[in-house]
Structures are given as C-alpha cells and as structure tokens.
Amino acid sequence: KADLIVSSGAEGGTGASPASSIRYAGISPELGLSETQQTLVLNGLRGQVMLQVDGQLKTGRDIVLMAMLGAEEFGFATSALIVLGCVMMRKCHQNTCPVGVATQNEELRRRFHGRSEYLVNFFTFLAQEVREYLAEIGVERMDDIIGRTDLIIRKSENESPKQSLITFDKILARVDNGAAIRHTIDQQYGIDHVKDVEMPH
C-alpha cells in the first residue's frame, strides 16, 4: 500500500540528464496529477494517500493551481538551487560546477556564495504569495482548495483562434461520487498485532 504518490513533471529534473531527455521526454505535471486524482477518487482511495507534485514549481500561483488539481505536498529543487546561485550550466554530474553548487572540488566549492537565509527568504515569500491567493479565493486553509478544480477559471480574453480550440475538460473534470478528494485517513496495514509492534523498543 502506498502512503505517498509523487507526480514529477518533465520540466524539473537534474542538469545531468541527457539533452534529448530534457527536450523530448515527459509531460507536464498537471496532466499526470489530474489523472491520478481522478482515478483515486473514482476508486475511493484518495482519502488514504498523499499526493505530491514537483516539476518547475516557482511561484505561489503554481502551488495553488497544483493544489486545486489535487496535490497536498510540493517539491522544490531547481528554484532552490537557483536561489543558492545555480547558473544552470548542466555540469552537475561532472564535478565541474563553476559556482560550486554541485561539486566536491575544493577550489570550485570556494566559489559558492549561497546562504541559508536566501532559502528562508524565498520560501517565506512563496508562502506569503500562496496565502494572498487563498485570501483572494476566500478560503482560510490550504486543505479547502485541494482537489477543487471547480475553482479554476479559464481566462478567455485575448485568446487566439487556435487557443480557443483547446479544451481543458479532461484535466479539470471533478469526480463527485461522495469519496474523499484529499488525504483524510491513515492507511490500514493490518499489522497491529505483529511482534515487532508489540515489543517495547
């Protein structure tokens, strides 16, 4: 049984990936996340698992949209590395990172000027932006928007004729079968009476 399901978008990942994989492999996290959410709700399993998403999440808007599609946890890597000084040279696996972010070379590591305070500031402002979006929507807690695709409104102004042909119905479909749309209960593993659990530690 899974406690956590991670949906990773193609936009994220390591700079050590081959260029062909970065350009041509994978899909956006929205597609996988919405399909996972819909399938779990249809089968009455959504309440038992947490959904996590990552893949170039950078702003509060990204977080709020992913939450509306069903995510409860959010992964950040590229944005955090950039805050610490990463210049996206794609040398992570060669031990030659010119700014000392991804290297064990002592000379290159001396070029690293990132500080923990930069990350604290970044995530503080990110959380503040999320809070502002929640206030604008009119909800008090993040839990109130998880899986609520009905809150996503498509902006139709300034659309080109081709853009107006794109439909988001399958991504924004909401399953209303009375099942939970976010994590509500812990998994039941049926191991309450095994000796390892009963023995004092």
Language-model regions, residue ranges each:
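Active-site or pore-adjacent capping/gating segments
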Residues: 74, 82-149, 153-154
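Short alpha-helical interface elements
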Residues: 30, 61, 65, 76, ...
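Terminal amphipathic helices with adjacent charged low-complexity linkers/tails
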Residues: 8, 139-198
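Glycine-rich phosphate/ribose-binding loops and adjacent secondary-structure elements
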Residues: 1-110
